[in-house]
Amino acid sequence: MRNILLKIYDSKFLNQEESYQLFTLISSGKITDIKLASILTAMKIRGESIEEITGAIKAFLDKMKYFPKPDYIFSDIVGTGGDAKNTINISTMSAFVAATCGLKIIKHCNQRISSKSGSSDILEKFNINLNASPEKSRKTLDQLNICFLFAPKYHDGFKYSNNVRTDLKTKTIFNFLGPFLNPATPPLSVIGVYNKNLINIAVNILKNLQYKRAIVLHSDNTDEVTLYGTTYVSELLNKKIISYQLQPESFGLKMHPKKILKINSLEENYHIIKEIMKGKGSKLYEELIAVNVAMLLKVFGYENLKENTKLALNKIRSGDVYKHIRNVANMLKEDNHARHNT
């Protein structure tokens, strides 16, 4: 451990194994707060390497609680957050639309970081039980194509660093781990990053973690596809990485001149999303969700983005997505009651 600390304090990078050892200790509560603060600060000042981030991810994955992983193909869709845009929860709603289209989605979710409402906050507004047992979540996935794994329920190793991270009041390596810590370890993923410079880092981490296929994207300082600018993409397929750019026309849509209005509260977020999922939302919001679903369909092998967008729009406008949300909530109610009665 001493050699690892000396390397960090000398502004030298750790290899993946050294990082794994360090974060195994951190996730076990074996590093004091003052030492942890110095480690995180030193790493932030010199910048964290792909190998260091990969080692940290593997350390937390090895300590996560069990989830019965399916033997069929499934994906996650997640954003890093941190863009401070306070828009509606695009990735969460895209997951529901994709499930309504027949894709299997296991979404790793957490509480809000910089937005007015995180994925778990909006799910609870829709009465989705995030404390469902792993077995119940898996059953919901099998029958309704989707389940949500709440990060604090599966990753209790983070509790040892929460106070230090709060006191530091700055982004650290921890802020970049979440999208890679899905307890089901999916073979597919779509990840949005808040900074264009993070695309290459994220896609190489996915390669290190041996994802089968994945997309990392960024557009207009947000962690999602937008309709008013260029979307920058790096895609991992068969261990090879390709990069390209997309415009709204790539999805068969027109450029929107105005940007999404900021959301001021959880209640406003919920109301807007509810109307969209009922097929009564604005065209801009419908299309914004649809293009993100199109990228999710792509990692499943549906390569035509224009056709993918049409399929997603049809599902959204039919109102079927809202019905699907209600079905998921109702299926999880039984487990919710059982939890409160034990």
UniProtKB/Swiss-Prot annotation:
Mg(2+) 1 binds at S91, E224. Anthranilate 1 binds at G79, N110. Mg(2+) 2 binds at D223, E224. Keywords: Amino-acid biosynthesis, Aromatic amino acid biosynthesis, Glycosyltransferase, Magnesium, Metal-binding, Transferase, Tryptophan biosynthesis. One of its GO terms (biological process) is L-tryptophan biosynthetic process. Binds 2 magnesium ions per monomer. Its cofactor is Mg(2+). One of its GO terms (molecular function) is anthranilate phosphoribosyltransferase activity. HAMAP family: TrpD. Belongs to the anthranilate phosphoribosyltransferase family. This is Anthranilate phosphoribosyltransferase.
